[in-house]
């Protein structure tokens, strides 16, 4: 299998592009996080068999609104929820309300793993994460793909990290 989880120790130092900051996978690898009403701007992305058709336009639109509101979060977290082969919902993490944007809050418990490779490997990453959740004895509710950089920055940095967030039933 060519897809693998990110190696411990994080990426080698790189020169920032000025677009997306370099991503350190270590804080996201094999973690459990709980969100309580975490705020996101939501955009709907049209796809053709899971290939996004208007993602760049949607991200640009959302980022303009977020930057105008001065609510850009430090984490630069962008989650994708593949609703169907023809539509996904994109969630961009923000610090506060963004006028003119659809706002949502996400709450829950999530297990995370970091993967590196081309986006076409996403189905393999999701299968691996599903097995990982089961191996931990947890019940999977939903998967989100967390994009860490745009395609141009992934190419410039030589890595394409994706964090898979598995929403799980909380332990009782």
Question: Where is each model-derived feature located?
Answer:
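A solvent-exposed interaction/effector surface
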Residues: 1-172
């Amino acid at each position: 299998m060519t897809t693998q989880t990110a190696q411990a120790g994080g990426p080698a130092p790189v020169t920032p592009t000025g677009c997306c900051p370099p991503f350190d996978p270590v804080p996201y690898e094999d973690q459990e996080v709980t969100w309580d009403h975490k705020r996101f701007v939501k955009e709907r992305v049209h796809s053709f068999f899971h290939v996004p058709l208007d993602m760049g336009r949607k991200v640009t639109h959302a980022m303009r609104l977020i930057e105008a509101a001065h609510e850009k979060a430090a984490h630069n977290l962008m989650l994708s929820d593949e609703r169907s082969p023809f539509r996904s919902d994109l969630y961009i993490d923000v610090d506060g309300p963004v006028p003119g944007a659809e706002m949502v809050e996400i709450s829950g418990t999530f297990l995370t793993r970091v993967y590196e490779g081309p986006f076409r490997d996403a189905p393999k990453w999701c299968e691996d994460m599903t097995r990982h959740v089961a191996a931990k004895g947890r019940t999977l509710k939903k998967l989100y793909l967390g994009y860490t950089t745009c395609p141009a920055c992934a190419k410039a940095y030589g890595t394409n990290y994706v964090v898979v967030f598995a929403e799980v039933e909380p332990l009782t």
